[in-house]
């Protein structure tokens, strides 16, 4: 058991999924290139892994599922740290995919261009304060999210502008005695009552301060909000500490965060735009422009492109399994579960997590590849011969809907932990402790979503529904693999993936 996690997957003599889990977290090892994405999108074959894919040494027959001694797994140190961190906010952007024959790029035209800070990994709109997962100040007039301290009160951009226009133009509205309720959706219906509400909450043209909320006041309000939450629910402090711990582990385990990926997709980085691969010619051109980790020159490959892309996905999946396994070990209580149950949870959970995180690399037109250096179009992937052309389309369909939820990395960190700790997986020996851990994670997720997305009251329920969708995607993926097993007799699966797919749905 002294081998490292990386060695257990690269060495052709070590192909057990349990070996992957049993690698000691106390050792400082280099598993994979820390700049690699954590989902299967680097298309190509690694020279080190070619022996594992040898058609004679490994067939498509699935090897028996085995377990090993997990005594080397060390429990990660878990500190109860107050949860305080600025989270990324991702807006909706239009992606204008501009394809050129020899110079391809992704052109983005956001309605309100954000700027990207590599240091803080934040998206910030020019007219908004940086998002904070605990910062949910409401407009005193309509209840919408306040953009700052305007005319003496916390107000949104809409009410600030309404009050300014009314005062500047000296507008007089028709009297209304209905005392209309002013909220986000109705604020434009009765201008008289809206202006009266502005005055009632204290908006004044003579207010000393207006504009963005002062940092000192923001910190004070943040402390008050945290204190109020903790007083209402004493357990919330522990839940926020758990969320902070999971986020930190997430950042360490997965080198390419959603914030970084979306920055690349929206062109808000100092790096050059990713090279667009949309046909065979651009694929060949891409080999000269993109530093692929796994790929060997197309001219030197005897296998067709569809098979090479499929095999490249396999090796990226293997790396993703490594990263997900390390993250799972950081979930409080996971390493204390029955050792066979740890293997079962990962066996069933890894691909659901891979497709969850793959969505961050996707838009409706394509997917980032090779650490964001390239962008392979959806149409090109669909054009591959069957059954290979059918593999990615369900993932794109899921990604478009999943990305509409506008989750950020702090949300995803908890969500993937919930996926791992699913107590209804087949073959579990001791379900109760698994369900106890997941219950705690679900509470942390619900609190996180309420604080981070106060305007989306149904987000928690919608997100749980996505877990069902993910299982269906994995089921369809396994079915396609069975088709390949019958039609592509000269192909083989990576041994680790063979073990994972055995008896999976």
From Swiss-Prot:
Activity regulation, short description: PDPK1 activates its transcriptional activity independently of its kinase activity.
Positions with biased composition (Polar residues): 17-26
Motif (9aaTAD): 495-503
Cellular component GO terms, alphabetical: cytoplasm; nucleus
Main location: nucleus
Post-translational modifications reported in the UniProt record: Phosphorylated at basal conditions and dephosphorylated when treated with the ligand. May be dephosphorylated by PPP5C. The phosphorylated form may be inactive and dephosphorylation induces adipogenic activity. Ubiquitinated by E3 ubiquitin-protein ligase complex containing FBXO9; leading to proteasomal degradation. Ubiquitinated at Lys-252 by TRIM55 leading to proteasomal degradation. Ubiquitinated by E3 ubiquitin-protein ligase STUB1/CHIP; leading to proteasomal degradation.
Segments forming domain NR LBD: 238-503
InterPro entries in the cross-refs: 1Cnucl_rcpt, NHR-like_dom_sf, Nucl_hrmn_rcpt_lig-bd, Nuclear_hormone_rcpt_NR1, Nuclear_hrmn_rcpt, PPAR-gamma, PPARgamma_N, Znf_hrmn_rcpt
Span list, region Interaction with FAM120B: 205-280
Residues recorded with modification Phosphoserine: 112
Keyword Ubl conjugation: yes
Gene Ontology molecular function: chromatin binding; DNA-binding transcription factor activity; DNA-binding transcription repressor activity, RNA polymerase II-specific; E-box binding; nuclear receptor activity; RNA polymerase II cis-regulatory region sequence-specific DNA binding; transcription cis-regulatory region binding; zinc ion binding
Stretches annotated zinc finger (NR C4-type): 139-159, 176-198
Functional summary from the UniProt entry: Nuclear receptor that binds peroxisome proliferators such as hypolipidemic drugs and fatty acids. Once activated by a ligand, the nuclear receptor binds to DNA specific PPAR response elements (PPRE) and modulates the transcription of its target genes, such as acyl-CoA oxidase. It therefore controls the peroxisomal beta-oxidation pathway of fatty acids. Key regulator of adipocyte differentiation and glucose homeostasis. ARF6 acts as a key regulator of the tissue-specific adipocyte P2 (aP2) enhancer.
Subunit details: Interacts with FOXO1 (acetylated form). Heterodimer with other nuclear receptors, such as RXRA. The heterodimer with the retinoic acid receptor RXRA is called adipocyte-specific transcription factor ARF6. Interacts with NCOA6 coactivator, leading to a strong increase in transcription of target genes. Interacts with coactivator PPARBP, leading to a mild increase in transcription of target genes. Interacts with NOCA7 in a ligand-inducible manner. Interacts with NCOA1 and NCOA2 LXXLL motifs. Interacts with ASXL1, ASXL2, DNTTIP2, FAM120B, MAP2K1/MEK1, NR0B2, PDPK1, PRDM16, PRMT2 and TGFB1I1.
Protein family according to the UniProt entry: Belongs to the nuclear hormone receptor family. NR1 subfamily.
Record's comment describing the protein's domains: The 9aaTAD motif is a transactivation domain present in a large number of yeast and animal transcription factors.
UniProt protein name: Peroxisome proliferator-activated receptor gamma
The organism of origin for this protein: Canis lupus familiaris (Dog)
């Amino acid at each position: 058991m002294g081998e490292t996690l990386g060695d257990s997957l690269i060495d052709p003599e070590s192909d057990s999924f349990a070996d992957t889990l049993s690698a000691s977290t106390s050792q400082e090892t280099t598993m994979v290139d820390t700049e690699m994405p954590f989902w299967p999108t680097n298309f190509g074959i690694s020279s080190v892994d070619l022996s594992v894919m040898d058609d004679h040494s490994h067939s498509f027959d699935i090897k028996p599922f085995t377990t090993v001694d997990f005594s080397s797994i060390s429990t990660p140190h878990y500190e109860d740290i107050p949860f305080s961190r600025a989270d990324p906010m991702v807006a909706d952007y239009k992606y204008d995919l501009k394809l050129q024959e020899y110079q391809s790029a992704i052109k983005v035209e956001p309605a309100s261009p954000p700027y990207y800070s590599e240091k803080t990994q934040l998206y910030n709109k020019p007219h908004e304060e940086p998002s904070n997962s605990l910062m949910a100040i409401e407009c005193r007039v309509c209840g919408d999210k306040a953009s700052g301290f305007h005319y003496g009160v916390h107000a949104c951009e809409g009410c600030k502008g309404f009050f300014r226009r009314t005062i500047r133009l000296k507008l007089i509205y028709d009297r209304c005695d209905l005392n209309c309720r002013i909220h986000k959706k109705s604020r434009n219906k009765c201008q008289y009552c809206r202006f009266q509400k502005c005055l009632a909450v204290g908006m004044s043209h003579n207010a000393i301060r207006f504009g963005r909320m002062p940092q000192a006041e923001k910190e004070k309000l943040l402390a008050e909000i945290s204190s109020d939450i903790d007083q209402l629910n004493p357990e919330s402090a522990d839940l926020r500490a758990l969320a902070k711990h999971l986020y930190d582990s997430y950042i360490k385990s997965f080198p390419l965060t959603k914030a970084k990926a979306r920055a690349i997709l929206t062109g808000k980085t100092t790096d050059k735009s990713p090279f667009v691969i949309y046909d065979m010619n651009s694929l060949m051109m891409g080999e000269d422009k993109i530093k692929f980790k796994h790929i060997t020159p197309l001219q030197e490959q005897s296998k067709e492109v569809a098979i090479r892309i499929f095999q490249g996905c396999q090796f990226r999946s293997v790396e993703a399994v490594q990263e997900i396994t390390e993250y799972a070990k950081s979930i409080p209580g996971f390493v204390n579960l029955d050792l066979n149950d740890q293997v079962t949870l990962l066996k069933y959970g890894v691909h659901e997590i891979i497709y969850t995180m793959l969505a961050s690399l996707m838009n409706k037109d394509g997917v980032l590849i090779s650490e964001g250096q390239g962008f392979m179009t959806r149409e090109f992937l669909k054009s591959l011969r069957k059954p290979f052309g059918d593999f990615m389309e369900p993932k794109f369909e899921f990604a478009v809907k999943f990305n509409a939820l506008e989750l950020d990395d702090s949300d995803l960190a908890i969500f993937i932990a919930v996926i791992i700790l699913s107590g209804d997986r087949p073959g579990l020996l001791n379900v109760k402790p698994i369900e106890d851990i997941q219950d705690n994670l679900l509470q942390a997720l619900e609190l996180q979503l309420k604080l981070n997305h106060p305007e989306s009251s149904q987000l928690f329920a919608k997100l749980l529904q996505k877990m069902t969708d993910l299982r269906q995607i994995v089921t369809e993926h396994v079915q396609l693999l069975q088709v390949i097993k019958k039609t592509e007799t000269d192909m083989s699966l990576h041994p680790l993936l063979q073990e994972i797919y055995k008896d999976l749905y």
